[in-house]
């Protein structure tokens, strides 16, 4: 029975912050509705005063007095709203701190239970540590074997060069079969070494462009410009006719 009463008391203490927050929020909702009502009353009395300011000054003054009363009540209501909001924030922050502390205590107790009977010396003496060291050594040996230059079949650079020259010769022979002539560059490459070097040293004569090379392009450009001008004139004539 005593444990039941103790549990009920603990539950009541746990629910106390939530109940307080609910009560404060309910009262805050009521004050916010009152704030909206007072603002509407002020706007209504101001409209009455503006309506009677030139025709009935007494009615206008009475409306302004009522507006002042509503304005004072509105200020008090807004101050109460601020106080309630601060109290709600304070209770929520305190409740969050309490829950966080309880969670930290539970985590500490769980870690203490997990580490019960475990020490650094015991971990160092276990076979697990020896197995880890053995596997690490094997991994290092494998890495060294993979990165060793002797790992795998090495490629002979001379064989690659010879194969590449053979492919170039086949391509050149194929071009000769298709064209029936030997290209100038291939003839130079087939000359003996001294003659080939001498021919390579001689520059090719530069090609000269004759003035007639650019005549077709210039005529085409001039014709396009004339067509554009004619189209522009036709457009202007159509606009003037309208």
From Swiss-Prot:
Lineage: Eukaryota, Fungi, Dikarya, Ascomycota, Pezizomycotina
Key words of the record: Coiled coil, Cytoplasm, Endosome, Membrane
Domain of life from the UniProt record: Eukaryota
Annotated organism of origin: Emericella nidulans (strain FGSC A4 / ATCC 38163 / CBS 112.46 / NRRL 194 / M139) (Aspergillus nidulans)
Protein name: Vacuolar-sorting protein snf7
Bias-annotated ranges (Basic and acidic residues): 233-242
Oxidoreductase listed as a keyword: no
GO biological process terms held by the UniProt record: ATP export; intralumenal vesicle formation; late endosome to vacuole transport via multivesicular body sorting pathway; peroxisome organization; protein transport to vacuole involved in ubiquitin-dependent protein catabolic process via the multivesicular body sorting pathway; reticulophagy; vesicle budding from membrane
Name of encoding gene: snf7
Signal peptide: none
